[in-house]
């Protein structure tokens, strides 16, 4: 894990909201064909708000750490707020520089959440 920011390493080793939800309204799987990362997102809604979220799957340091940080951020947000998020939002939430070649890893979780909410 040499070369990664300490914040990314910490979140990848002990990710927040990792695991499955027993009761969920939405389950969405998404793979990153570029590198082989894959994520499964479980979401429980309360009206138009994301009440609870969990994830599992396999991924690199960047994708797991981003899933951890973004999952904490989106909990309690409305569908509209989440759907309005973009790569700039993601960069602010993560708070560390993500090189362009790893941006697809970093946004895997957010893409899965948004696709799940829109399906």
What are these regions (language model features)?
Residues 1-119:
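Domain-level signature for proteins that mediate thiol-based redox and metal-cofactor handling
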């Amino acid at each position: 894990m040499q070369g990664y920011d300490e914040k990314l390493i910490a979140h990848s080793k002990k990710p927040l909201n990792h695991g499955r939800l027993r009761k969920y309204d939405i389950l969405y799987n998404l793979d990153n064909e570029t590198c082989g990362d894959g994520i499964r997102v479980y979401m429980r809604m309360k009206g138009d708000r994301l009440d609870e979220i969990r994830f599992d799957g396999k991924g690199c340091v960047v994708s797991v750490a981003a899933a951890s940080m973004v999952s904490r951020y989106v909990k309690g947000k409305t569908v509209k707020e989440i759907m309005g998020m973009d790569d700039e939002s993601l960069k602010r939430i993560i708070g560390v520089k993500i090189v362009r070649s790893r941006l697809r890893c970093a946004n895997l979780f957010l893409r899965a959440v948004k696709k799940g909410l829109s399906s």
